[in-house]
């Protein structure tokens, strides 16, 4: 690969890192060609972009990403980007790539691809042991909906108590009025 090709790959990766909220780095070595192609198809169907690149090119692309914290970059360099690295890019729900990897493993009865690391909203999750937790993450819209429901719940309880209190008060007054007659 010549310098021009490397520069083009770095630019593509940089744009992908800048334009996506999350990315997962996986190791899919020891997968057969058929399994690798199936994994790529599954990624495409789920709307996940899957790219394979050399670790040095990935690091150079990450150098160009302004929102990448230095401790995250260091962890990526020292712990995650070793050996084969495939990158899964996704924008919406951060759990989609994790669910995709989990489902692929289950369908093929394999232990690969292995999650090496995941970067989600400024946080880095290192290691395959995080796959289960990452697959259960809720989308931002779902979380916002749950928060709004929780915030509305006390208000609904107060209104209901006021309504029932009004009915009770009118019932007590009516009873006292009937009793005095």
Swiss-Prot record:
GO cellular component, one term: ribosome
UniProt-listed InterPro entries: Ribosomal_uL10 (IPR001790), Ribosomal_uL10-like_sf (IPR043141), Ribosomal_uL10_bac (IPR022973), Ribosomal_uL10_bac_type (IPR047865)
Organism of provenance: Amoebophilus asiaticus (strain 5a2)
Record-stated family: Belongs to the universal ribosomal protein uL10 family.
Name of the molecule in the record: Large ribosomal subunit protein uL10
UniProt GO BP: translation
Top-level taxon of origin: Bacteria
Subunit structure: Part of the ribosomal stalk of the 50S ribosomal subunit. The N-terminus interacts with L11 and the large rRNA to form the base of the stalk. The C-terminus forms an elongated spine to which L12 dimers bind in a sequential fashion forming a multimeric L10(L12)X complex.
Keyword terms, alphabetized: Ribonucleoprotein, Ribosomal protein, RNA-binding, rRNA-binding
NCBIfam families listed in its UniProt record: PRK00099.1-1
HAMAP family: Ribosomal_uL10
Gene3D superfamilies documented for this protein: 3.30.70.1730
One Gene Ontology term of the molecular function aspect: large ribosomal subunit rRNA binding
